[in-house]
């Protein structure tokens, strides 16, 4: 299957946007430009160097440190809100996308369902897969790729009390007493 290509020659950053109103009022720019998560970025280094983005960040921080809450992410959004592109969802599939509370967006955004089933980059934005109590539906993908590195077989050491508490919490989900925060990916696979 052929992937659509995007030109970022005259842009600086590619990512997926956010709708949090507070970001725009704090950083003082219009919501129509959106806000991006800086955890996964594709950066045009030529643009970055030519426009001295690093110096701009330093100057902005010194002048407006009271506006900065999310460090580099806020700085980049405040400075580059007009100079970014958004890539397809599959290049930055975040934890939120797998949450039940977000599932209505799967119908709203073309490509999101495909991204959930076949992500190019998984961005674990909440509990990390190495956290014993992580219940991310693709937690095992992390360990699959970890096992392809020199750290093969490395797993976190979990104390007995944490194992018992987490086991009890998982039992609540398994028995249906508590509803999972995450979607069931099998439901999306069957609908294809």
Task: Go through each PLM region and give its residues.
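Short, small-residue-biased leader/transition segments that mark boundaries at the very start
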Residues: 3-8
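Conserved catalytic core of nucleotide-sugar-dependent glycosyltransferases
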Residues: 9-59
